[in-house]
């Protein structure tokens, strides 16, 4: 443990907390300092010039990163008949109706994403208090309430990332792993920032992208020069 602590302390040593790094330099700095003994997640955090307490300043959406997140995503699908079979063929981990409802209601939720066909939303809607707080409630705006379960499952498995601004105006997400190349991480960052930019609400006033930073699970954070993200 002492040796691991020294490695982590060393990773923080020469990071300039006041400097705004270019995207290329930030990715390199974070990647080379991800020294934990596991494949650390590379995370992005954006401070936005919005107040999500107002409905016209909510930022929410979904983006499919070009290189995925490196995370194995378990997908549950509420579907029946042919749609249930489509979901299974597409690679869904769990497919069901009342049985899946009962499992969720009992707290057995070994999955990361929930998809539902429109005809079963009457059933799924009753799980709002269970799925909602976990960010798992299917939503047509996010493509998780759909008759096209094949595409929805494929997108989820490919590394589609859902985002939503928090109370303090912050959006954060994992955009890859330390084992990714610098080029792939940079491309994922650009794709995520582009999605956030396109999701700018009409009610937003002043500077929208106020601050962007990158970090790894156990490593230091660095601030990005927003101008290099265009």
From Swiss-Prot:
Role, per record: Binds directly to 23S rRNA. The L1 stalk is quite mobile in the ribosome, and is involved in E site tRNA release.
Organism listed in the record: Paramagnetospirillum magneticum (strain ATCC 700264 / AMB-1) (Magnetospirillum magneticum)
Gene this protein is translated from: rplA
GO biological process: regulation of translation; translation
Record CDD domains: Ribosomal_L1
HAMAP family in UniProt: Ribosomal_uL1_B
UniProt GO cellular component terms: cytosolic large ribosomal subunit
Protein name, UniProt field: Large ribosomal subunit protein uL1
Highest taxon above the source species: Bacteria
Keyword RNA-binding: yes
GO molecular function: rRNA binding; structural constituent of ribosome; tRNA binding
Keywords: Repressor, Ribonucleoprotein, Ribosomal protein, RNA-binding, rRNA-binding, Translation regulation, tRNA-binding
Family, per entry: Belongs to the universal ribosomal protein uL1 family.
Cited PANTHER family: 54S RIBOSOMAL PROTEIN L1, MITOCHONDRIAL, LARGE RIBOSOMAL SUBUNIT PROTEIN UL1M
Entries under InterPro entries matching the protein: Ribosom_uL1_bac-type, Ribosomal_uL1, Ribosomal_uL1-like, Ribosomal_uL1/biogenesis, Ribosomal_uL1_3-a/b-sand, Ribosomal_uL1_CS
Pfam name, any one: Ribosomal_L1
Subunit structure and binding partners: Part of the 50S ribosomal subunit.
SUPFAM superfamilies: Ribosomal protein L1
């Amino acid at each position: 443990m002492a040796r691991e602590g020294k490695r982590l302390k060393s990773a923080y040593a020469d990071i300039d907390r006041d400097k705004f790094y270019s995207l290329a330099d930030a990715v390199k700095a974070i990647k080379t300092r991800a020294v934990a003994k596991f494949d650390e997640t590379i995370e992005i955090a954006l401070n936005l010039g919005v107040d999500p307490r107002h409905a016209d300043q909510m930022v929410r959406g979904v983006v499919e990163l070009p290189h995925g997140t490196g995370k194995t995503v378990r997908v549950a699908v509420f579907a029946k008949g042919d749609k249930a079979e489509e979901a299974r063929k597409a690679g869904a981990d769990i497919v069901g109706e009342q049985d899946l409802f009962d499992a969720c209601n009992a707290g057995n939720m070994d999955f990361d994403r929930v998809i539902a066909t429109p005809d079963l939303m009457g059933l799924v809607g009753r799980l709002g208090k269970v799925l909602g707080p976990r960010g798992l409630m299917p939503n047509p705006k996010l493509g998780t309430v759909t008759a096209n379960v094949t595409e929805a499952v494929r997108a989820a498995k490919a590394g589609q990332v859902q985002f939503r601004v928090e109370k303090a105006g912050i959006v954060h997400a994992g955009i890859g792993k330390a084992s990714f190349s610098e080029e792939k991480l940079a491309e994922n960052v650009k794709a995520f920032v582009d999605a956030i930019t396109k999701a700018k609400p009409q009610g937003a006033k002043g500077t929208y992208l106020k601050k962007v930073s990158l970090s790894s699970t156990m490593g230091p954070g660095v601030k990005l020069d927003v101008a290099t993200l265009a």
